[in-house]
Amino acid sequence: MRRPCSLLLSGLFALFAIAGGCQRLPPLTAIVAGGTGPPTLVLLHGYGSSAERWAPFTQTIRWPAPARFVFPQGPDAMVRTDDAADGRAWWPLDLTSYRQAGKGAPDLSSARPPGLKRAASQVENLLDDRRIVPRGPVVLGGYSQGAMVASEVAFRSRVPLSALVVLSGTLVDEQSWESHFGERRGLPVFLAHGRQDSTLPFEAADRMRRKLEAAGLQVTWCPFDGGHDMPTAVVIALNDFLARLHL
């Protein structure tokens, strides 16, 4: 039996802590904003960022009431990056050492990060908690490392989803993911990536796009001139994508 969630109110936001369910995983926290839902947009931050930094994103999304926005917090705290000493992660990475080795953008398509399954399971538990994610249409998405977790949930679980949003993500465990693409046939997917991304390769995102389309998913592809970022053009395209869902 799950423990009751704890609820802390702060302005327009509510902070929930949920139990890890039968898998005995540590609890996630999530900032919840907007209306009571549905529909609900669940957006996972990237490596070294946090739910608090992503919560203002609601101001750029034109989704009418009673839409709800949920920003889960990565379980690993105090991740030190070049520009943030208080960030969080979905699993530990050593990007600094990788960059110093001069290897450029890593190809993770054949990798199976040891913390990916845990993070995905925690997100699945959150999606199953009706106090946080009400029954009804759910759009799951993420940026960078968060996009990998969102994709893992989409392609390795049976969680009901109305759409998937992949912002500057990449292919991970490609062979396994691809074997499940067909199970999400018809799913709308928003996929955005910078052509000059030096953190996660553009080529891997483009390959993911082609394979998703071949499997019958409805991909909205938004390549842009830029690096590991989310420019205004992507936000505009994402708003158009969400509007076309008619949720």
Question: Where are the model-predicted features located?
Answer:
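Serine-hydrolase catalytic machinery in alpha/beta-hydrolase-like enzymes
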Residues: 24-135
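The feature captures the conserved acid-bearing segment of alpha/beta-hydrolase catalytic domains
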Residues: 166-244
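Residue in the alpha/beta-hydrolase core beta-strand immediately N-terminal to the catalytic nucleophile
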Residues: 139, 163-165
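Conserved alpha/beta-hydrolase "nucleophile elbow" surrounding the catalytic nucleophile
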Residues: 45-47, 138-143, 194
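Conserved hydrolase catalytic core segment
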Residues: 152-163
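Bacterial N-terminal signal peptides that target proteins for export
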Residues: 1-9
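Gly/Ala-rich beta-loop-alpha elbow adjacent to hydrolase catalytic centers
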Residues: 142-146, 150
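Bacterial Sec-dependent signal peptides at the C-terminal "C-region" and cleavage site
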Residues: 13-26
